[in-house]
Regions:
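N-terminal helix-turn-helix DNA-binding core of bacterial DNA-binding proteins
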Residues: 18, 36-79, 90
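A structural signal for well-ordered alpha-helices, especially hydrophobic packing surfaces
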Residues: 31, 117, 151-154
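Short, locally clustered residues in the helix-turn-helix/winged-helix DNA-binding domain
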Residues: 31, 56-60, 121
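DNA-binding alpha-helical recognition surfaces that contact promoter or target DNA
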Residues: 82
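Hydrophobic/basic alpha-helical segments enriched in Actinobacteria
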Residues: 22, 46-47, 130, 134-135
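N-terminal leader segment of winged-helix/HTH proteins
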Residues: 1-45, 141
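Charged, amphipathic alpha-helical coiled-coil/dimerization segments
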Residues: 35, 85-145
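Exposed, interaction-prone assembly regions rather than primary DNA-binding/catalytic cores
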Residues: 141-155
């Protein structure tokens, strides 16, 4: 569910307990700003951000098993079951059996799933493109270095 209430982030008066708190708030609100248009688009179709994460990863994998998908997303197979089943029911995701290892399902997007994933991801790209346009190349590179350093915490 997408919360409709607008937030003026400049007027949010949270007490800082540490000098980095403002940066944490910007990261939180920035991510919400990045995904809000996509979240509305998905919600109108009975889907959510978790469905988009699944579609996004499958679209970029040549062939991915359910276990590999769960590992990539950082969730358990059990946590993946319900949203993935929903995507199967909506015919957005399909599977084939892995040759020689018939227990394993290899996931792929259907034509409809491919089109939906592309449209949702483009909404996020557009938002990111607009935000990156507010700074120069050095600022964009610095932002990418910070994001990379944060992502490295997963390794």
């Amino acid at each position: 569910m997408v919360i409709e209430k607008k937030i003026n982030t400049a007027s949010v008066s949270l007490k800082s307990l540490d000098p980095l708190d403002h940066s944490l708030e910007l990261l939180h609100f920035g991510f919400r700003g990045l995904t809000v248009a996509a979240d509305h688009f998905l919600e109108a179709r009975g889907l959510s951000r978790v469905h988009h994460r699944i579609l996004y990863v499958i679209a970029r994998a040549d062939a991915i098993s359910i276990g590999e998908l769960a590992t990539t997303l950082g969730v358990s197979n059990q946590a993946l079951h319900r949203p993935l089943s929903h995507l199967f029911e909506q015919a957005l995701v399909q599977y084939t059996r892995e040759p020689g290892r018939h227990r394993f399902k290899l996931l792929a997007l259907s034509e409809t799933g491919t089109a939906l994933e592309a449209e949702v991801t483009e909404l996020e790209r557009r938002t990111l493109r607009e935000a990156l346009a507010t700074t120069d190349t050095d600022g964009q590179d610095a932002w990418r270095r910070v994001m990379l350093a944060l992502a490295e915490q997963l390794n």
